[in-house]
């Protein structure tokens, strides 16, 4: 049971992704405030010989929550078990994981907001008292027994912290929000990844890829690898500014980092719904995309760059987006856009 929940097939692509991940806080680029706090918490926990307090990491996808969890395990010198909320279907699944942890180990649960409520309730005594309540038998003869667990650290990650229940969220002693990365930080990440992958790249090319990476390291590394493919097939393998610019344009990634689906979302709201306000379900139906995907993957960045507002009545495209997409903007439409 535990094997199914904790492991996946390890592909060559996974190996490449893993090689790009920093292993220590000193190698981790960006999120400076979080790193400084974690250094203190980790050093204090190690001095006391205790596990690190439970940690909740939240923010848009691709910002390094899983990577940061593995960095914490390395800094603490302990093992880490990685799973996800949807993978833990029954309380028995979680019990199997918890009882197989070693002292001071880290349990990382991605998408923790998607935990089954009955599973979540098993976590409460485990997080607070390092004890596990299990029920043996059924019906009138059923009885509950309490097992002692090794002390451990739970690191939860979520893109939608608002969907977590208050009892679960309140049990985390350390709560950090990961923010989008600056272009300069992404440029350093791209240069580091290029060095690991033996890719030749100049400063201007690294900056151009970073500029179009939506503030997200995962996207920056993905674009770097696709530009590398272009450079190897259409050029001499070296990535200069011209090569990067042509490749990114071919990929449909514009100067703001917008891709086809971003433009479809904005244009659909403008052309079909008068610029908004409009609900997420209507947007999803009009562009043929899942509503949760739009909320998790596309909407946060569009809001971050000021192209989309979320109001009580729905989503509204801003004047800035109208100007960028070269659509005429009618002022009286945008009473909500202030």
Swiss-Prot record:
Homohexamer. Forms an RuvA(8)-RuvB(12)-Holliday junction (HJ) complex. HJ DNA is sandwiched between 2 RuvA tetramers; dsDNA enters through RuvA and exits via RuvB. An RuvB hexamer assembles on each DNA strand where it exits the tetramer. Each RuvB hexamer is contacted by two RuvA subunits (via domain III) on 2 adjacent RuvB subunits; this complex drives branch migration. In the full resolvosome a probable DNA-RuvA(4)-RuvB(12)-RuvC(2) complex forms which resolves the HJ. InterPro entries: AAA+_ATPase (IPR003593), AAA_lid_4 (IPR041445), DNA_helicase_Holl-junc_RuvB (IPR004605), P-loop_NTPase (IPR027417), RuvB-like_N (IPR008824), RuvB_C (IPR008823), WH-like_DNA-bd_sf (IPR036388), WH_DNA-bd_sf (IPR036390). Its main location: cytoplasm. HAMAP family: DNA_HJ_migration_RuvB. Residues 182-252 are annotated as: Small ATPAse domain (RuvB-S). It catalyses: ATP + H2O = ADP + phosphate + H(+). Signal peptide: none annotated. Its EC number is 3.6.4.-. The RuvA-RuvB-RuvC complex processes Holliday junction (HJ) DNA during genetic recombination and DNA repair, while the RuvA-RuvB complex plays an important role in the rescue of blocked DNA replication forks via replication fork reversal (RFR). RuvA specifically binds to HJ cruciform DNA, conferring on it an open structure. The RuvB hexamer acts as an ATP-dependent pump, pulling dsDNA into and through the RuvAB complex. RuvB forms 2 homohexamers on either side of HJ DNA bound by 1 or 2 RuvA tetramers; 4 subunits per hexamer contact DNA at a time. It is an enzyme of class 3 (hydrolase). It is found in: Cytoplasm. Pfam families: AAA_lid_4, RuvB_C, RuvB_N. The gene is ruvB. Has 3 domains, the large (RuvB-L) and small ATPase (RuvB-S) domains and the C-terminal head (RuvB-H) domain. The head domain binds DNA, while the ATPase domains jointly bind ATP, ADP or are empty depending on the state of the subunit in the translocation cycle. During a single DNA translocation step the structure of each domain remains the same, but their relative positions change. Mg(2+) binds at residue 66. One of its GO terms (cellular component) is Holliday junction resolvase complex. Residues 255-338 are annotated as: Head domain (RuvB-H). Belongs to the RuvB family. The keyword Nucleotide-binding applies. This is Holliday junction branch migration complex subunit RuvB. DNA binds at residues 310, 315. The keyword Repeat does not apply. It comes from Caldanaerobacter subterraneus subsp. tengcongensis (strain DSM 15242 / JCM 11007 / NBRC 100824 / MB4). It comes from the Bacteria. The lineage of its organism: Bacteria, Bacillati, Bacillota, Clostridia, Thermoanaerobacterales. GO terms for molecular function: ATP binding; ATP hydrolysis activity; four-way junction DNA binding; four-way junction helicase activity. Residues 1-181 are annotated as: Large ATPase domain (RuvB-L). ATP binds at residues 20-21, 62, 65-67, 128-130, 171, 181, 218. GO terms for biological process: DNA recombination; DNA repair.
